[in-house]
Amino acid sequence: MSDKILFRSGEATVFAKPGQFTDAMPEILIGDVSGPVGQAFANMMGQTAGHTRMFAIRACNQMVKPATMMVPKVTIKNSKMIELFGGVVQAGTADAIVDCLIENILPRDQANNLCIISLVWIDPQTLTDPNLDLKDMYRTNYEATKLAVTRAMRNEPSVEELIAKRHTMKHEMYDPAA
């Protein structure tokens, strides 16, 4: 059996194709069910108005392993957002987790002892976009989830990388030097 994984974190952003609001920005925690991530996972089983949590499932009766709890970063206000969260976003998230097992990014021998918390973003503009591309929304959530899990399991970025890029990389939404 591989070493026990106590606490890993990762994030990724995958941008939508032009003209879409389907950017995906999951933030991931991975850890053993007996540790702090497991405790947080158990505490999230209760529901909060507007922030419904869901297990990542591939299809009915096919919950992924490690057990993965999806939590929206935005308030779920209507049935369309529920459909996106529990449909295309859930499918992309679930498929990414299973593919991480297939590709040995997540250790198969710990699949029943790990849990994952995935904070997911759904841009409210998707609700009124008449040209919403669900395939692009699936793609961005799949790719971003897989990348976030990979980064978590590889402890990326390293401290050295963060220090080296401190003054060369800028936040996409705010540049204090501008």
Regions found by a protein language model. Give the residues of each.
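Accessory interaction regions appended to the cores of large information-processing enzymes
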Residues: 1-178
